Amino acid sequence: MTDDYSKLKSEIMDLVSEEFLKTKDDIISVMIENNKLKRAELVVGNDSLPPPPPTPSIVKIEHTTTTSNIDDLPLPPPIQEVEEEEPTQQNIEQQQQTQDESDDYYKTVHPLGVQDTYEDEEYFSSYSKISLHHEMVFDKRRTAAYYHAISKSKNIFKDKVVLDVGCGTGILSCFVAKAGAKKVYAVDASDMAHRAELIVQQNGLADIVTVFKGKLEHIAFPEYVDVIVSEWQGAFLIFESMIESVIYARDNLMRPGGIILPSKASIYLSPINVDSFYNQYINQWSNVFNLDMSPLIPFAQEELLEEKTIRNYYVDNQDSVLDKPIILRTIDLSTITIEDLSKTVKTFEFQVPNGSKYHGFGSWFSVWFENLDDDDDDNDNNNNNNDNSNDDENKQQFAYYTIDRDGELVKSTYQQYSIDSKGLTPLFFKQSSNVLELSTAPGTGDQHWKQVLFLNSKEKILQSSDKQLDTTSIKGTIRILQNKDYRRHWWIEMYVSLKTNPFDYSYQKYLI
């Protein structure tokens, strides 16, 4: 018995040595053809002998990998955590196939090729902390916007299958379930997914909401979805690049004609005066309990303005904005591509009153939720407007909802809101339904994104070189590029010229 097994083992090793450049499937096939491997005829009576090799997989994945390049293969994706049962071979192969498909997707659509780790360990670790989610969930303007937008979208969610990308605590998934969704798949790659499952159970929604832990791109879902919901926005809107996962979900997981909430977004830019920042962090050294500590002011300037980008500073005074903003970048979630998003170039010209303090540029963003349900008073207005359908001035006025600084829902029209907000978030699309806007513009109310300031190294007092003009021209070009090595980050380059006497030219490069 032992001699037969040793002989068989020797023959197999000789065969493997001859065929070492062939794949595992090829080796198994050759062994079977030559009748070298007959596991059914082996009667193993020694417990120390190895068990027979496993049956080849039912699902055959074609490949050309050889022993010469096997070390170059990427590590497999993390397997979805299932506490109740061990992952099966079929599940593992399905996960590997899902990652291969996502790699093929990014290889095709991303100008930088297949996605790297995106600093995943640090990124997802930070989103496992309750303190970070406390900041987001109790950002009353942020959470109120999603709550009201979802509550007013029952016509969108009724009996639909919904995907929550980056579910965090699961709060949006619960909102969606209560709005009438048939099924909600909540996905998060951080450990917060386990806490989300507790929240879902605690609120009696486990029959509707299923939580997945893992990267969206590596999960095989049981069905396509009708609606995608996500709070993907970062500082400067696109920081963290989470929007790429939303685009992936749209292209691979959503049925044709599906809906994404929020549906549109825009970034704005304007020259800005931030005396409040200077007074709080720099000029305050001039008088401290009757002591003149002004010698520290230049050191404070050097330290605070060294990196030039000041994140998470809220500008409360709308008058700090020195001219009407430009629309720096627009995003339609139904059509935006990763390639288009990866680079933005925009020229600008602002006219700023002479004598203004100019500290640099401020940026903010807005997102919109469209196709909200009609209220009873909306229906009444629509009926009245239909009676005067030939009168352009009496055409239908869709509701325009916003969230005030206290987190309360405000109903108005865009025309009225634009006046109240001093035109800081101009629309780039034609309103054709009831809409809710969540704005991070100065003066609209604090939120955890605040604004992003691109500050000069020192304060400038503007005075036009043309004495006939009351304003000073600020011209320039801004270029936004995704960092090729750390793709959750973005480079911001600015070429700026001030029409002063003498002319002032500058180039700054910021990393966000």
From Swiss-Prot:
SUPFAM superfamilies, alphabetized: S-adenosyl-L-methionine-dependent methyltransferases
Predominant localisation class: cytoplasm
Enzyme Commission number: 2.1.1.319
Coiled coil: none
Family annotation (InterPro entries): Arg_MeTrfase, Methyltransf_25, PRMT_dom, SAM-dependent_MTases_sf
Gene Ontology molecular function: histone H3R8 methyltransferase activity; histone methyltransferase activity; nuclear estrogen receptor binding; protein-arginine N-methyltransferase activity; protein-arginine omega-N asymmetric methyltransferase activity; protein-containing complex binding
Active site location: E231, E240
PROSITE patterns: SAM_MT_PRMT
Record keywords: Cytoplasm, Methyltransferase, Nucleus, S-adenosyl-L-methionine, Transferase
Keyword Transcription: no
Region (Disordered): 67-103, 375-395
Protein family per UniProt: Belongs to the class I-like SAM-binding methyltransferase superfamily. Protein arginine N-methyltransferase family.
Protein's name according to its UniProt entry: Protein arginine N-methyltransferase 2
Lineage of source species: Eukaryota, Amoebozoa, Evosea, Eumycetozoa, Dictyostelia
Gene of this entry: prmt2
